[in-house]
Amino acid sequence: MPAQAGSNHMLDLMRRNHTREAYLELIKHFRTKIPGVEFSTDLISGFCGETEQDHLDTLSLIQEVEYEMAFMFTYSMRERTHAWHKVEKGVWTDDLHPAIKKKRLADIVQTYRDTALKRSQKVDLNQIKLVLVDGYSKRSTREHPQMTGRTDTFKRCVFNVDCGSDYQHLNNTIQLQEGDYVVVQINEAAVSTLKATPLFRTTLTEFSQMKWKAKDFKVDFNGVLRRENVIV
């Protein structure tokens, strides 16, 4: 959900077809209708005519939405764009000093990182997640092999290679392969990466049928998956 900026003044200058209020209402609607949905966005600092208040409005938007991922840039002129034509005609000026753009971008990045960490620890930590295995982690070693994959919100997840063959046979250990789906429990939640305990290999169909029960699953200190005090 690209926002570009958090102030209506900037959105109008950028010719975006939404207001801050409409954008936030849409975010609220999606979160109500799709529990667990997360958002990524694009943000620009230092667009022509951006004031300090415009910048603060962008920071407050980040804090309110709590994006999972963000692509953040300083504004630079591109030929044939609306802003380029305005500057060429002398209507606008690319009036912010590069140092101000850089400082504002740093503010945006730090605000994003702070809120993303807060949200990840709130919505990811200790949760059961489905992960698509990408392959071995770059930090994997022969002594400590680790895999990496993506959650259903595209967050990177790192975990050991061994897990149960399926949810009925947790003690039947297999080694995960690229392309497998694995159910994990999140142990550590950072801004862009999760660390997890792999529980068992699964399929999309199987997981979709059991996902509504995920809140009932617990992992004890021995790594045994239990539901309602009964070993699954």
What is the predicted role of each segment?
Residues 2-100:
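Conserved non-cysteine loop/helix-boundary elements of the Radical SAM core domain that shape
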